[in-house]
Amino acid sequence: MPNAPQVHISEVGPRDGLQSVQTVMSTADKCRWIDALAAAGLREIEVGSFVPARLLPQMADVAEVVGHARTLPGLCVMALVPNRRGAQAALAAGVHKLTLPVSASEAHSLANVRKTRGQMLAELREVIALRNAEAPG
């Protein structure tokens, strides 16, 4: 179909699906889950969050999960980062894309990342500067 729209699918389950559950999934199970998602044809997966393990123990192994995901041919590996420190760790681990939560409402921003929208926009500028310095293009 020459005029068919392009649809971009970005799977976030390994991050969003795990961050609010109490039980910590093993690293091996996370890697198997990502393998299955990639085998199903997904080409972009948000595999975790680079956040302090004391806040989200489910994400304590995110660098290892990124390392595994990077071995899958053709997979774009994404991770959520709440700030410059998280972005530094994510880039060091080898992610291809970063996502940063900038909320539409002040209340959600404070509940989600304990920062105002203005503070998150400042974080976004810092993350962009870091990305431009370390991984331009």
Region annotations inferred by a language model:
Residues S10-V12, H96-A104:
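Non-cysteine beta-strand/loop elements that form the S-adenosyl-L-methionine
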